[in-house]
Structures are given as structure tokens and as C-alpha cells.
Amino acid sequence: MTEAEQKAAFLGGLVVSFKEQMHTDVLVKPGEEAPPIPTHKAVLAARSKVFRNMLDSDECKTSPEESITLPDLSHDELKSLLEFLYSGNLKAPYNQYRSLYLAADKYDISYLQDVCRNHFIASLSSRNVLDILELASIPCDTILKDAAINHIVKHMEEVVVPMKYETFVQRNPDLSVEITRAYLRETKAKAKDHGAPLNGNTRPRIW
């Protein structure tokens, strides 16, 4: 067994303690009517300052079963989040990434947010880029937002022609302005590179 394999096996014991509920001391409840998930205070507190504050609150201390509730997450999403806290690996299905990304922002789990962000950036397409741009604006994630806008600028016709874009514009006028400005900057830069600066007779196409 290599050193890397030994290390993985050693750290895997923490995941086993979660899955087998070894000496758990707090219940984490999802937002829906579903069973709570037993876990360990030490892991929650170590991974998130927000969780640490929740566990230190009088409400949690006086609860007969010592529990905290994460109302934003379903039972399956909560399980994926907790498994990530123990393992550092995200094995959740794609349809959970949005909720986990927002939960990572809300509960200050920066590594989970980074993992979700990288996944979104890697999966950007003309079909999902508007949804991802809207998502990035919720926690004001400039990295994800810039990546989405850059993708839109490079694939402008594919993104803005479908009817979906009209709905997006109505719902997000400020983001639409940012897209237009980014497209203008890109068009001017390309014109300059080709020695044809924009003038009154040469205008970029704006949808």
C-alpha cells in the first residue's frame, strides 16, 4: 500500500464514524419532514464557524435532543453536505449542486463553495449559462459571474437568440446591462486587434 493509499484509509475512518453513527452527539434536521441525521459537533464546528455559533447558542444547548435545523436543504442534500464535511469529497448528483453551493455560502464552507463553483464553470454551456449567471449573483460570486459572462460573450448568438433570454432580461435588467457592456468591450478589443477601430459607421451587433 502506498503512502497516499495509507493516508486515504486513515482519513476514511472519519467517514466511517459518520456512516455508522459512532458516538454521535447532535442531530441535524433537514427543512422537509424527514428524519434528522446524527453527526458530531466537533466536525460541524471545525468545518464551519456558522455551525460553531449555532451549536454554542442557547437554543441548541437547551434542546432536549441537541439539534440544529438547516431549512434550505432536503434530506438527501443534507446527507451530501455532511458527507462532504467528513471526507472533503463531493459525490452528490448534479441536481443537488445548486442547493449545496448556496448552503456553502450561507454556512461559510468555502471549500465546498469552491468545489461547486469549479463544477459549474467546467459545465458551462449555452443552455445553462444564464441559470448559472443568476445563481452566481445570489452570493455575489464574482469568479463564477465573470466566467458565465465571458462564456455568454463568446457564444452570444447561441445564448441571446432563444426566447429564454427575453425572460432573463426582464428578470435581471442589471445583469443584462453587464452582458452588453462586456460584449461591447470584447467587440472593441477585437476591432482594435484587427486595426479597425469602431466609429460611427461601425457598430457592434446588440441583441
Swiss-Prot record:
Note on domains (UniProt): The BTB/POZ-like domain may mediate the interaction with some component of ubiquitin ligase complexes.
Stated role: May act as a substrate-specific adapter of an E3 ubiquitin-protein ligase complex (CUL3-RBX1-BTB) which mediates the ubiquitination and subsequent proteasomal degradation of target proteins.
Start and end residues of each BTB domain: 24-94
PROSITE patterns tied to this protein: BTB (PS50097)
Single biological process term from Gene Ontology: protein ubiquitination
Pathway connected to this protein: Protein modification; protein ubiquitination
Organism: Arabidopsis thaliana
Keywords: Ubl conjugation pathway
One Pfam family recorded for the sequence: BTB
Descriptive protein name: BTB/POZ domain-containing protein At1g01640
Subunit organization: Interacts with CUL3A.
Listed InterPro entries: At1g01640-like, BTB/POZ_dom, SKP1/BTB/POZ_sf
